[in-house]
């Protein structure tokens, strides 16, 4: 019997030697507690959540792409949140209106009828059942819907508050407590009647004509939102960079010089200080160079014209003879034409 017992223990020990923990890659001894799951083995202390590295409460875990997670971390990482109750969704998910929903939470926004199994219709950004949608269409097609009472708003009788449309009578002025009209104004997340607003001294943007609540730009005799003070050509915000004014309009440096000054033909930047003018173009001093070898040229350097660009003598001499001949003939023809035009009488 002792011989048989020793033989069994030896087989078990040999079996443990061939097993390795999935997490720590260490082996097992006869005294180690072991967890076996899906044909893989762990030390009991290694069998933990892949996210928080804590043991699984009540031994419950969820597996995703070969990794095991506790219930909390699995929901945080992979479960969608309901668009109504903001709780994690386990089981059936309804995807609609650019959000996910519990089946019991996806309801008509007017009558609260569940829509998961009967379908819905989109109306002014709302999910409605067929009956409510028909009533809304009959009440007034294409009009705003009040975000508070969900009723249609007569044309021209809505106000915007935090991005949504409302009947103005749902609100009172923050300062005088009078019921608001369509002439109300929103400032720092609060609504004011027009009279109270005008006494607050808040600047109005010269572009969008709305109050400026944060940083303000003062230019051209007006006030502007930072993002609304833009070049009148490219419409890019100046964002604190230098701007140029002409006849009451703002311009960025590039478009101001393009319209009213000189831009370097090569680099495209406005020319400042000394410039080179040749071939009906303007260059910065540092940019006036051979169009082939990029050798810097100056007023004393002899250059040739090729394709309306400057070419140094060394590069020009490398041109084929036939090409140089055609260039010379073309320049002569152009000079003759220019001379003829200069001698022609102007229109009477």
Curated annotation (Swiss-Prot):
<protein>
    <recommendedName>
        <fullName>LIM domain-containing protein unc-97</fullName>
    </recommendedName>
</protein>
<keyword id="KW-0677">Repeat</keyword>
<dbReference type="GO" id="GO:0005925">
    <property type="term" value="C:focal adhesion"/>
</dbReference>
<dbReference type="GO" id="GO:0005654">
    <property type="term" value="C:nucleoplasm"/>
</dbReference>
<dbReference type="GO" id="GO:0007005">
    <property type="term" value="P:mitochondrion organization"/>
</dbReference>
<dbReference type="GO" id="GO:2001046">
    <property type="term" value="P:positive regulation of integrin-mediated signaling pathway"/>
</dbReference>
<feature type="domain" description="LIM zinc-binding 4">
    <location>
        <begin position="205"/>
        <end position="255"/>
    </location>
</feature>
<dbReference type="Pfam" id="PF00412">
    <property type="entry name" value="LIM"/>
</dbReference>
<feature type="domain" description="LIM zinc-binding 5">
    <location>
        <begin position="264"/>
        <end position="315"/>
    </location>
</feature>
<feature type="domain" description="LIM zinc-binding 2">
    <location>
        <begin position="82"/>
        <end position="132"/>
    </location>
</feature>
<dbReference type="GO" id="GO:0098609">
    <property type="term" value="P:cell-cell adhesion"/>
</dbReference>
<keyword id="KW-0440">LIM domain</keyword>
<dbReference type="GO" id="GO:1900026">
    <property type="term" value="P:positive regulation of substrate adhesion-dependent cell spreading"/>
</dbReference>
<feature type="domain" description="LIM zinc-binding 3">
    <location>
        <begin position="146"/>
        <end position="196"/>
    </location>
</feature>
<comment type="function">
    <text>Component of an integrin containing attachment complex, which is required for muscle development and maintenance. Probably function in adherens junction. Affects the structural integrity of the integrin containing muscle adherens junctions and contributes to the mechanosensory functions of touch neurons.</text>
</comment>
<dbReference type="GO" id="GO:0005634">
    <property type="term" value="C:nucleus"/>
</dbReference>
<keyword id="KW-0539">Nucleus</keyword>
<dbReference type="GO" id="GO:0017022">
    <property type="term" value="F:myosin binding"/>
</dbReference>
<dbReference type="InterPro" id="IPR001781">
    <property type="entry name" value="Znf_LIM"/>
</dbReference>
<dbReference type="InterPro" id="IPR047946">
    <property type="entry name" value="PINCH-1/2-like"/>
</dbReference>
<dbReference type="InterPro" id="IPR017351">
    <property type="entry name" value="PINCH-1-4-like"/>
</dbReference>
<comment type="subunit">
    <text>Interacts with unc-98. Component of an integrin containing attachment complex, composed of at least pat-2, pat-3, pat-4, pat-6, unc-52, unc-97 and unc-112.</text>
</comment>
<dbReference type="InterPro" id="IPR047944">
    <property type="entry name" value="LIMS1/2-like_LIM1"/>
</dbReference>
<dbReference type="GO" id="GO:0045216">
    <property type="term" value="P:cell-cell junction organization"/>
</dbReference>
<dbReference type="GO" id="GO:0009925">
    <property type="term" value="C:basal plasma membrane"/>
</dbReference>
<dbReference type="GO" id="GO:0055120">
    <property type="term" value="C:striated muscle dense body"/>
</dbReference>
<dbReference type="GO" id="GO:0040017">
    <property type="term" value="P:positive regulation of locomotion"/>
</dbReference>
<dbReference type="GO" id="GO:0031430">
    <property type="term" value="C:M band"/>
</dbReference>
<keyword id="KW-0479">Metal-binding</keyword>
<feature type="domain" description="LIM zinc-binding 1">
    <location>
        <begin position="21"/>
        <end position="73"/>
    </location>
</feature>
<dbReference type="GO" id="GO:0005911">
    <property type="term" value="C:cell-cell junction"/>
</dbReference>
<dbReference type="GO" id="GO:0060298">
    <property type="term" value="P:positive regulation of sarcomere organization"/>
</dbReference>
<keyword id="KW-0965">Cell junction</keyword>
<dbReference type="GO" id="GO:0007517">
    <property type="term" value="P:muscle organ development"/>
</dbReference>
<keyword id="KW-0862">Zinc</keyword>
<dbReference type="GO" id="GO:0050954">
    <property type="term" value="P:sensory perception of mechanical stimulus"/>
</dbReference>
<dbReference type="GO" id="GO:0046872">
    <property type="term" value="F:metal ion binding"/>
</dbReference>
<dbReference type="GO" id="GO:0005912">
    <property type="term" value="C:adherens junction"/>
</dbReference>
<dbReference type="GO" id="GO:0046716">
    <property type="term" value="P:muscle cell cellular homeostasis"/>
</dbReference>
<dbReference type="GO" id="GO:0005737">
    <property type="term" value="C:cytoplasm"/>
</dbReference>
